[in-house]
């Protein structure tokens, strides 16, 4: 939510994968979940990624990508319900401005947030479609921070993750925004574990594409 190409995790992954057979792709998609889903589906068809990483609210869009392994950082599975319940604020004078002050997007290659009643209400069926896609099976693994401030509000729910995917997660001693040390110590090794290619493939002969959704 409000992330993009110059966010921490995409930047670190791109830097780490320079000169390797891994390519990290980040594209900013629309805050309207249905427009965003259509954009992402088009990119997946174009790029044929080998792995999708969903961070924060981007986890819901990532769940709707079928047929490839999934990794998640601080998946905000409770966010759709939160946004639906908060939609009424958009109808109050000054409500939209208040939401933009609370969730201020940094300058740069970031997702513009559009707090509109109709858009926020769409997150209900968006979450239903994500759960339906996840129920079809696949590889799902998540990382949660012990000091994630969104866990108090229920936006991030480890218990809900367990309900859907079991104990397929690691909890690190950090925040919602995975610190650099854990990107190197946890996320990147897990990426290599999933995308461990054939030993006889020479460097430069094969590239693995990773798409990051935030």
Spans of features found by a protein language model:
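Short hydrophobic segments within beta-strands
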Residues: 1, 53, 143-145
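Active-site catalytic motif of lipid deacylating hydrolases and related acyltransferases
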Residues: 1-46
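Gly/Ala-rich beta-loop-alpha elbow adjacent to hydrolase catalytic centers
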Residues: 53-58, 62
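Aromatic pocket-lining residues of Rossmann-like dinucleotide-binding sites
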Residues: 65
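The alpha/beta-hydrolase serine catalytic core
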Residues: 69-198
């Amino acid at each position: 939510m409000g992330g993009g190409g110059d966010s921490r995790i995409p930047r670190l992954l791109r830097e780490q994968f320079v000169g390797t057979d891994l390519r990290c792709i980040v594209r900013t998609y629309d805050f309207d979940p249905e427009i965003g889903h259509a954009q992402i589906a088009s990119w997946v068809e174009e790029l044929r990624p080998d792995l999708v990483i969903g961070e924060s609210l981007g986890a819901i869009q990532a769940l709707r990508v079928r047929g490839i392994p999934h990794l998640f950082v601080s998946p905000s599975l409770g966010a759709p319900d939160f946004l639906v319940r908060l939609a009424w604020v958009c109808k109050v004078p000054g409500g939209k401005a208040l939401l933009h002050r609370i969730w201020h997007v940094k300058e740069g290659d970031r997702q513009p947030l559009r707090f509109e009643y109709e858009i926020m209400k769409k997150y209900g069926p968006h979450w239903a479609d994500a759960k339906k896609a996840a129920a079809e099976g696949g590889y799902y693994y998540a990382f949660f921070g012990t000091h994630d401030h969104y866990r108090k509000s229920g936006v991030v729910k480890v218990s809900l993750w367990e309900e859907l995917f079991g104990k397929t997660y690691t909890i690190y001693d950090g925040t919602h925004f995975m610190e650099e040390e854990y990107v190197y110590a946890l996320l990147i090794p897990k990426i290599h574990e999933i995308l461990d290619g054939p030993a006889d493939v020479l460097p430069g002969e094969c590239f693995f594409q990773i798409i990051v959704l935030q």
